[in-house]
UniProtKB/Swiss-Prot annotation:
Assembly with partners or alone: Binds MYD88 via their respective TIR domains. Homodimer (Potential).
Membrane topology: Single-pass type I membrane protein
Example of a GO biological process term: immune response
Function: Participates in the innate immune response to microbial agents. Acts via MYD88 and TRAF6, leading to NF-kappa-B activation, cytokine secretion and the inflammatory response.
Protein name as annotated: Toll-like receptor 10
Main subcellular location: membrane
């Protein structure tokens, strides 16, 4: 605690120094910590740039003149809690920048003074001086602000040497104080005086003189061994020339009558704010409480904090009434294990009441209490259970601020609540309140704290809290962010540590006024429902408290621990309307593409061909190789256009067929089966022929059925070789005349894989020889016999005609 106090005071000094002379940017504080290292002398290897040196809690017993020569920039030196017995301030003559020097809690018996003009803080308290260690040089330290002293004797002459200094704080820390000359303290010129008394010290004289000395007076370690009552019963409790307006008594252990007299004494002084902290009292009450004089006072505030009772022989009701009858504005009785409180049966002037951390119950509000000026009521840390009962009490006051946290409060739906329209701030945290609490809130509330309760949802029947600006509903059981339809002015919302998986869209849309949101540490489910919430931090003016480390995914498991800002949810997968539009556009584009292909590439024709090929492929798979060979009946199938039939009839057929029937030709007209479709007949003819001859001309490429025949022949699945197609170019075909679907034909023509009909009749012999050689197949004798017999039967059935030249074109 001592070190903390030193650091606090040092920070104050540094801030003051910076206000007088701002440091340059390159000048930085460098702290060297050598505390609690059992050092017996100051280290010789200190860094020259050191500005703060802590040598506290060591074994130093003497300081040498050369100890601090190397640290010329030293500003703060802490030497408390060592064993130093003598001090020569000339040791610091080279430390011109020294501002803070702490030598408290040593064994100092003497000090040799040297003018340290820049010193602002000097603490010599809790040492072994016989008298106050003050001389003329101390009076020349014009910048001194905080001074700590100690000594076994206090005399007026000690303080005369520094009476002209205006000090901020004087701290007197005594190990023993057997002698005090009355009237010594008022000589000091200080704003605050803090006295730490040793045991068995008559504090009364110091209290009287202290009130005459400073505006703020603090006294620590007051016990009842000083015979205060017997001493003061012989003296007048009145006091003249009082200066103190703030009085703090800390660590007080007195009989009740002693405390009673202190209250009465202070009541008639200049003290406006009186605080007693860590007080223990007991014993019998000999003084009459009704004798307390409440007149002639400037008292405004009384605080009793951390009150403990020993064996007590007085009714506590009398104590409560003694305090509540005081005509003051502010009363605090906290941490006192107080089971109840009594008020007079007439109106009081209390504006602020603090009964925190007691054991008050609902019985407090079952009596009539007249508080027409009450604005702040603090009842946290008690045993209150019924919220509606509190509201009925508050309705008779102009209450503005109410703290009911850390109680046992509940509210039932059938209980009526009536609050004054003045309530603006209410703390209901750490209770047992459920959803029904929203039906028992003042309409005027502006700041509401409901954290650590049992709230699961904000009911739709909630009172419209149009003035609510801040709502803290953290550490509850909510599964969704509350909408702002009932809180139209809400600007700050804290909803961390609930069970929110996916905040609803209603919050994003209805809470446009929210500027600060704390929704961290919730088990977020990172799906599309969370997309709008994630975008709040980026695309809105909402400040997300704790973003982004406190906002992580809990579900799905593969994203657990992932920060929300690192989760990427695609707009297409989360926006149903956009997804539908995208699908429609894609389908439309595909439809247009298919339509274009159908028009430009004759796609329907290819689809029909694919279907026919598929049927043929399935049929071929079910047919054995022997059956396939047995089905072959012709050497060649001839495909041609009707416009080229004369050439086929007059030239091709006569030159290919022989009278011995060694070459069998299949023509479409001759073997057409009326029971099958045209495409099935074409497939059948191609399957029953070893070769397919195509008579090419401009007429051929314009014929639809010729294209079918070429397509099926090209994809003849039972031919293992690729030479089963024979092309005869009857007339030249310009490439631009060939439709796109004839891409295979184009490729063959480019390779010149065809027989060209010669215009010179003398070359025809060679043409027919090549053609016969191309279609001539070595057929087994048995096969030839079978084929000849079948062919003869077919010829007889067709009236003895060997070849029919009838052809149906472009059916």
């Amino acid at each position: 605690m001592r070190l903390i106090r030193n650091i606090y005071i040092f920070c104050s000094i540094v801030m003051t120094a910076e206000g007088d002379a701002p440091e340059l940017p390159e000048e930085r504080e460098l702290m060297t910590n050598c505390s609690n290292m059992s050092l017996r002398k100051v280290p010789a290897d200190l860094t020259p740039a050191t500005t703060t040196l802590d040598l506290s809690y060591n074994l130093l017993f003497q300081l040498q003149s050369s100890d601090f020569h190397s640290v010329s920039k030293l500003r703060v030196l802490i030497l408390c809690h060592n064993r130093i017995q003598q001090l020569d301030l000339k040791t610091f003559e080279f430390n011109k920048e020294l501002r803070y020097l702490d030598l408290s809690n040593n064994r100092l018996k003497s000090v040799t003074w040297y003018l340290l003009a820049g010193l602002r803080y000097l603490d010599l308290s809790f040492n072994d001086f016989d008298t106050m260690p003050i001389c003329e040089e101390a009076g020349n330290m014009s910048h001194l602000e905080i001074l700590g002293l100690s000594g076994a004797k206090i005399q007026k002459s000690d303080f005369q040497k520094i009476a002209h200094l205006h000090l901020n704080t004087v701290f007197l820390g005594f190990r023993t104080l057997p002698h005090y000359e009355e009237g010594s303290l008022p000589i000091l010129n200080t704003t605050k005086l803090h006295i730490v008394l040793p045991m068995d010290t008559n504090f009364w004289v110091l209290l009287r003189d202290g009130i005459k000395t400073s505006k703020i007076l603090e006294m620590t370690n007051i016990d009842g061994k000083s015979q205060f009552v017997s001493y003061e019963m012989q003296r007048n409790l009145s006091l003249e020339n009082a200066k103190t307006s703030v009085l703090l008594l800390n660590k007080v252990d007195l009989l009740w009558d002693d405390l009673f007299l202190i209250l009465q004494f202070v009541w008639h002084t200049s003290v406006e704010h009186f605080q007693i902290r860590n007080v223990t009292f007991g014993g019998k009450a000999y003084l009459d409480h009704n004798s307390f004089d409440y007149s002639n006072t400037v008292m405004r505030t009384i605080k009793l904090e951390h009150v403990h009772f020993r064996v007590f022989y007085i009714q506590q009701d009398k104590i409560y009434l003694l305090l509540t009858k005081m005509d003051i504005e502010n009363l605090t009785i906290s941490n006192a294990q107080m089971p109840h409180m009594l008020f007079p049966n007439y109106p009081t002037k209390f504006q602020y009441l603090n009964f925190a951390n007691n054991i008050l119950t609902d019985e407090l509000f079952k009596r009539t209490i007249q508080l027409p000026h009450l604005k702040t009521l603090i009842l946290n840390g008690n045993k209150l259970e019924t919220l509606s009962l509190v509201s009925c009490f508050a309705n008779n006051t102009p209450l503005e601020h109410l703290d009911l946290s850390q109680n046992l409060l509940q509210h039932k739906n059938d209980e009526n609540c009536s609050w004054p329209e003045t309530v603006v701030n209410m703390n209901l945290s750490y209770n047992k309140l459920s959803d029904s609490v929203f039906r028992c809130l003042p309409k005027s509330i502006q700041i509401l704290d409901l954290n650590n309760n049992q709230i699961q949802t904000v009911p739709k029947e909630t009172i419209h809290l149009m003035a609510l600006r801040e709502l803290n509903i953290a550490f509850n059981f909510l599964t969704d962010l509350p909408g702002c339809s009932h809180f139209s002015r809400l600007s700050v919302l804290n909803i961390e540590m609930n069970f929110i998986l996916s905040p609803s869209l209603d919050f994003v849309q209805s809470c446009q006024e929210v500027k600060t949101l704390n929704a961290g540490r919730n088990p977020f489910r990172c799906t599309c429902e969370l997309k709008n919430f994630i975008q709040l931090e980026t695309y809105s003016e909402v400040m997300m408290v704790g973003w982004s480390d406190s906002y992580t995914c809990e579900y799905p498991l593969n994203l657990r621990g992932t920060r929300l800002k690192d989760v990427h949810l695609h707009e297409l997968s989360c926006n149903t309307a956009l997804l539908i539009v995208t699908i429609v556009v894609i389908m439309l584009v595909l439809g247009l593409a298919v339509a274009f292909c159908c028009l430009h590439f004759d796609l329907p024709w290819y689809l029909r061909m694919l279907g026919q090929c598929t049927q043929t492929w399935h049929r071929v798979r079910k047919t054995t190789q022997e059956q396939l060979k047995r089905n072959v009946r012709f050497h060649a199938f001839i495909s041609y256009s009707e416009h080229d039939s004369l050439w086929v009839k007059n030239e091709l057929i006569p030159n290919l067929e022989k009278e011995d029937g060694s070459i069998l030709i299949c023509l479409y007209e001759s073997y057409f089966d009326p029971g099958k479709s045209i495409s099935e007949n074409i497939v059948s003819f191609i399957e029953k022929s070893y070769k397919s001859i195509f008579v090419l001309s401009p007429n051929f490429v314009q014929n639809e059925w010729c294209h079918y025949e070429f397509y099926f022949a090209h994809h003849n699945l039972f031919h293992e070789n690729s030479d089963h197609i024979i092309l005869i170019l009857l007339e030249p075909i310009p490439f631009y005349c060939i439709p796109t679907r004839y891409h295979k034909l184009k490729a063959l023509l480019e390779k010149k894989a065809y027989l060209e009909w010669p215009k010179d009749r003398r070359k025809c012999g060679l043409f027919w020889a090549n053609l016969r050689a191309a279609i001539n197949v070595n057929v087994l004798a048995t096969r030839e016999m079978y084929e000849l017999q079948t062919f003869t039967e077919l010829n007889e059935e067709s009236r003895g005609s060997t070849i029919s030249l009838m052809r149906t074109d472009c059916l």
